[in-house]
From Swiss-Prot:
This is Choline transporter-like protein 2. Its main location: membrane. Choline/H+ antiporter, mainly in mitochodria. Also acts as a low-affinity ethanolamine/H+ antiporter, regulating the supply of extracellular ethanolamine (Etn) for the CDP-Etn pathway, redistribute intracellular Etn and balance the CDP-Cho and CDP-Etn arms of the Kennedy pathway. It is found in: Cell membrane; Mitochondrion outer membrane. It comes from Dictyostelium discoideum (Social amoeba). GO terms for cellular component: membrane; mitochondrial outer membrane; plasma membrane.
């Protein structure tokens, strides 16, 4: 920083102190990026309108007949199919397979019916035991050779489809059942992304339950940490590890149970989704075992330093105790994140089913094909999620930083501004949204590049493109490190922006200089406190996922229930991040304020320090009078 910039910076700092911790001569910064963000969201609204207009989630949820009619709706009014194919199936909500033998084996027709048959035919000469295609009347004493009429088979309802439920039947009938199971497997795996989104839609209540559980655990953790910092910190360490161990054991036993059930099923009647669930549980179990081992090593390495981190947490608790509304701010952030995620998934389901229907050579529905225009729209929608999610988290970080800094920069802490959290929030809304938009945009771009690299790595998998796969993995590793650096830079920039009203680039520059100058002094605090906050996230996430896994494993309408559980895990981690960010951001803000305090003041009566004695003693290590 040049001497002229440093002089301007000191003048701004003195203004902060005069105004009881709040710099009042702020102005809007980075306005261009705020306008860009608003224009991008105008595009998101257009994308949502396109998805709602063209998407048909019922195609997957309710199923279709071989003509493309959605079961359980009036397809004539929807006007998707031509007049000769469209049919009103309002009173026919279930998919049924009319099977019949032909020259190449077993063939089938697909229709919508009122209810699944509850018994298997015994006499094909009885018209009441036959089921026919649309417009065909069962003929007495005969069945149709082309499959328009065949005998009923007792069926059970799976994913809105009538699947034969037969035992001790003839070889021919078992062959028919095998064919239908194969058809269901093909249909359910024809577009796995659509099926996953459908499962998320069917389990929306459990997603909300999981979010509420995570929110309750987060509020409890923060409230107790305020009054019992030392006890809760140690409890968090052991509880997080215990929950992780219990979750590992639960996943192991559920993996074994699922594998046993799969092996006891007739091979021809095994669903692909069962196998995918077993594989997913096995992979998750192995990952959890590795994570448990890593956590054990980290705990051994940081055991003595955890006591030091407790002191800084207590100092943050002093600041938070003066502003109790800070406990409720994560709820506001949670509502924003939850509402936006629900909106994004909802529109995503519509976009995933907005493609053109595809059919086989007998004009039976097989899936959907997205053209290049739809693919670009889906990419736009995905990037919007990354940018907006980062924007909301940045809003939380900047608000917390502004509230804590307004407490730090007053000699008498009773002079802290009234309602510091919400005052800081309104300052952010008024002056700093452009800076937040820029910081979150940079982070979203890096995250998007990493997702593209993951896609390329998956595309090269199984092919003899070893060099390309190696390059992609290296790039993914590099951008992973770069993403962590951007998050670090963003956080420091938001702190300086909230204190002095800098633009994003100015704040990032000044924040990085402060950390670089005091790197040895603050590194240990940052490392230990960040690890403790991460343990809090693990505790909340592991407990939430464990409860959700128990609730969802018995859900009948989910074909791949691990996906909702994983999403609940992400939601719980995001919610816990919002809660932990209160202490995490408080610690980082205090450290940067401390460095600023050291640079500007020397402890003399004319230029006294603003830090508390306990904080100064902790950071200085030996309680020396010299600050830096």
């Amino acid at each position: 920083m040049s001497s002229e910039d440093l002089q301007d910076h000191h003048e701004i700092g003195n203004e902060v102190i005069k105004k009881k911790g709040v710099y009042t001569k702020k102005k809007c910064q980075d306005c261009f990026f705020l306008i860009l963000f608003l224009l991008f969201w105008a595009g998101m609204i257009v994308v949502a309108a396109f998805g709602v207009k063209n998407g048909k989630p019922d195609r997957i949820v309710k199923g279709t007949d071989q003509y493309g009619n959605i079961c359980g709706v009036n397809n004539i009014e929807q006007g998707i199919l031509n007049e000769t194919q469209a049919r009103d199936t309002t009173n026919e909500p279930y998919v049924y397979f009319i099977y019949y033998p032909d020259l190449i084996g077993i063939n089938y027709r697909v229709i919508c019916i009122e209810e699944c048959p509850n018994s298997t035919y015994t006499d094909l000469n009885d018209p009441n035991q036959l089921i026919c295609d649309y417009g065909t009347v069962p003929a007495t004493n005969q069945i149709s050779p082309n499959g328009t009429c065949m005998g009923k088979i007792k069926s059970k309802l799976i994913f809105n489809r009538c699947i034969p439920d037969v035992t001790n039947t003839s070889v021919v009938l078992n062959s028919i059942v095998d064919e239908i199971y194969q058809f269901v497997n093909n249909q359910l795996t024809s577009d796995l992304s659509v099926e996953i989104l459908t499962d998320l839609t069917n389990s929306w209540r459990y997603l909300i339950y999981g979010a509420l559980i995570a929110m309750g655990l987060g509020l409890t953790w923060i409230f107790l940490l305020r009054f019992f910092a030392g006890f809760i910190t140690w409890l968090t360490v052991f509880a997080a590890y215990a929950c992780l161990g219990l979750l590992t054991a639960q996943v192991y036993f559920q993996w074994q149970d699922s594998k046993d059930a799969y092996e006891n099923t007739i091979p021809s009647q095994r669903l692909v989704m069962q196998e995918k669930n077993i594989l997913a549980l096995k992979v998750i179990f192995i990952i959890l075992c590795v994570v448990c081992g890593i956590f054990a090593l980290i705990l051994l390495a940081l055991f003595s330093r955890i006591r030091i981190a407790i002191r800084i947490i207590k100092e943050c608790s002093r600041a938070i105790g003066i502003m109790p509304s800070i406990f409720f701010f994560p709820i506001f952030i949670f509502l924003l994140l939850c509402g936006f995620t629900v909106y994004w998934v909802y529109i995503g389901v519509y976009l995933a089913t907005a493609g053109s229907p595809t059919y086989d050579d007998q004009y039976r529905f097989t899936g959907y094909e997205a053209d290049s225009k739809l693919q670009k729209i889906q990419i736009y929608h995905f990037f919007g999620y990354l940018w907006t999610f980062a924007f909301i988290l940045a809003l939380n970080q900047t608000t917390i930083a502004g509230a804590i800094s307004s407490w730090y920069w007053v000699q008498d802490k009773k002079d802290t501004p009234f309602f510091p959290v919400w005052s800081s929030f309104f300052r952010v809304i008024r002056y700093h949204l452009g800076s937040i938009a820029l910081g979150s945009l940079i982070l979203a771009i890096v995250q998007f590049i990493r997702w593209v690299l993951r896609f390329l790595e998956k595309k090269f998998k199984g092919k003899e493109a070893y060099l390309a796969r190696f390059i992609v993995r290296c790039l993914n590793c590099i951008f992973g490190c770069f993403e962590r650096f951007i998050k670090f830079l963003d956080k420091n920039a938001y702190i300086m922006v909230s204190i002095y009203g800098y633009s994003f680039c100015q704040g990032a520059k000044r924040g990085f200089q402060l950390v670089l100058t005091n790197i040895l002094r603050v590194a240990a605090v940052n490392l230990v406190s960040s690890f403790l906050m991460f343990l809090g996230r693990v505790f909340i996430t592991a407990a939430t996922v464990g409860i959700s896994l128990y609730l969802l494993k018995e859900h009948e309408n989910l074909s791949f229930y691990i996906i909702p559980v994983i999403l609940i895990g992400f939601i719980a981690f995001a919610i816990s991040t919002g809660f932990m960010s209160v202490y995490d951001m408080s610690i980082d803000t205090m450290l940067l304020c401390f460095c600023e305090d050291c640079e500007r003041n020397d402890g003399s009566p004319e230029r006294p320090y603003y830090m508390s004695k306990s904080l100064r003693k902790f950071v200085d290590g030996k309680g020396r009078s010299k600050c830096c």
